[in-house]
């Protein structure tokens, strides 16, 4: 039963329901060999190109980009993609956590985490994690997913927002970022990889609004 198919009573145990959504995420299968290609970063009238490789160890290598800030940005996107494709069992990740139902709204049913991850929250709907609110390295990140890509072997987030904030005060840390991701399979039945990511970031404090596009082309398995 999915979060949207029937009302969920607040306070009930949601471990099995949350596990279904967790296991519905698309991840790379064991034995993933890695891939390489051409990377393009653009912002305004500026475009920078280079080459990249993600190895079987899921470590990213980017070459041919001299601008350190752009190099860091491209590497960061590739790292983020790889880290979210790692396949870890539900027990490996969440064995020390409990999952309790909160209220249900149009975004999904709230999942309140207890145990090791106390303070974290999720929302789930139709076996998709539609909201993530997690404490990571002294900050809080809140992600809302509004559209996904169904691969036939799990879903990938397509359209989503991300906002960082202070865990104590709730003050925002930077502007909200809106993402649109396009994925493609490397070959027939092959692993799905990122083809394009567009990030629009709102202005915050002295930091202006920005729009960055990352494209990954000529993709080939290693």
Q: How does the language model describe each region?
A:
Residues 5-6, 21-23, 106, 113, ...:
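Generic preference for well-ordered secondary structure
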Residues 18, 22, 33-37, 52-54, ...:
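A structural signal for the main folded, soluble domain(s) of proteins
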Residues 108-222:
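Gly/Pro-enriched, hydrophobic low-complexity segments
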Residues 29-31, 44, 103-105, 152-154:
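A generic structural signal for short, solvent-exposed coil/turn residues
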Residues 16-23, 91-95, 139-143, 176:
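Short amphipathic alpha-helical surface micro-motifs
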Residues 1-44, 66-68, 89-90:
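N-terminal leader/targeting segments and the immediate start of mature chains
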Residues 49-142:
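An acidic-aromatic
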């Amino acid at each position: 039963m999915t979060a949207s198919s029937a009302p969920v009573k607040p306070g009930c145990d949601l471990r099995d329901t949350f596990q279904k959504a967790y296991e519905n995420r698309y991840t790379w299968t064991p034995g993933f060999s890695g891939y390489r290609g051409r990377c393009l970063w653009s912002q305004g009238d500026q475009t920078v190109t280079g080459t990249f490789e993600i190895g079987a160890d899921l470590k990213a290598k980017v070459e041919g980009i001299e601008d350190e800030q752009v190099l860091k940005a491209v590497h960061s996107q590739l790292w983020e993609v790889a880290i979210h494709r790692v396949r870890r069992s539900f027990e490996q990740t969440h064995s020390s956590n409990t999952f309790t139902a909160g209220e249900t709204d149009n975004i999904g049913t709230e999942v309140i985490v207890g145990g090791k991850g106390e303070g974290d929250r999720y929302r789930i709907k139709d076996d998709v994690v539609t909201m993530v609110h997690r404490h990571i390295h002294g900050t809080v990140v809140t992600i809302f997913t509004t559209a996904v890509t169904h691969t036939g072997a799990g879903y990938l987030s397509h359209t989503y927002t991300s906002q960082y904030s202070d865990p104590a005060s709730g003050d925002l840390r930077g502007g909200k970022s809106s993402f649109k991701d396009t994925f493609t399979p490397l070959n027939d039945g092959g692993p799905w990889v990122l083809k394009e990511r567009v990030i629009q970031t709102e202005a915050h404090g002295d930091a202006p609004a920005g729009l960055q596009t990352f494209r990954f082309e000529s993709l080939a398995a290693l």
